[in-house]
Amino acid sequence: MFVPFLIMLREGLEAALIVSLIASYLKRTQRGRWIGVMWIGVLLAAALCLGLGIFINETTGEFPQKEQELFEGIVAVIAVVILTWMVFWMRKVSRNVKVQLEQAVDSALQRGNHHGWALVMMVFFAVAREGLESVFFLLAAFQQDVGIWPPLGAMLGLATAVVLGFLLYWGGIRLNLGAFFKWTSLFILFVAAGLAAGAIRAFHEAGLWNHFQEIAFDMSAVLSTHSLFGTLMEGIFGYQEAPSVSEVAVWFIYLIPALVAFVLPPRAGATASRSV
């Protein structure tokens, strides 16, 4: 529940910030009449992401067992790529995102008689990017943790992001976005490492990967996945009490370079924004 909550809080807050920045810029430049058009783009993006998520989830439920495992592995790999890209992309562009959005709004509203649709599509693509990232991560998370709690956590995270977005827009709160994205990004890298190890496990169960399947270690006597804390670790970080050598290797092969890249100072002009 906690991982879907955090991911949807982060992704939802990114989308809310995009919408808030666009709406504020439209009002500040005496173009508030276009805010309604902006919301059309937001709703279209939300509908696309929701529809795609439902379609993929319902379709894959009919797959045979091996194909289901293969699909789970592919989705996990896609989720790892998206989460990693999300972490480092936000780290790179967060300082300039406001200027980029304002320039995109100006460009959209200068396109002759079709500027309304241009604004709709600009907002649509900006919000849909965040939503599609969430779709693939949630598909991977729901496959690892079956039950009502992951969807509930995702909905609570999204609802919290919406509330925070409105408060930021109205000026009711100031949030240190630099610290928020820094610490959630670090957490997400550990989540992605667990997904990468889970992908190898899924490919083995699908019959595609049968190398290095010896048990690396057995922690069942110390931290069983049947215990409360073990269950939480499994749901959040993909913890396995008796992982294979290949799972442990993939976990380290992904996480160590990712952490090194993360702790290195960003290049000039790519530091995180401090607050909004």
UniProtKB/Swiss-Prot annotation:
Residues on Periplasmic side: 1, 56-69, 140-147, 201-244
UniProt-annotated location(s): Cell inner membrane
Cellular component per GO, a single term: high-affinity iron permease complex
Broad class of the protein's primary localization: membrane
Name of the molecule in the record: Ferrous iron permease EfeU
Source organism of this protein record: Escherichia coli O6:K15:H31 (strain 536 / UPEC)
This protein's UniProt keywords: Cell inner membrane, Cell membrane, Ion transport, Iron, Iron transport, Membrane, Transmembrane, Transmembrane helix, Transport
Entry's family note: Belongs to the oxidase-dependent Fe transporter (OFeT) (TC 9.A.10.1) family.
Role, per record: Uptake of Fe(2+) ions across the membrane.
Transmembrane feature ranges: 2-22, 35-55, 70-90, 119-139, 148-168, 180-200, 245-265
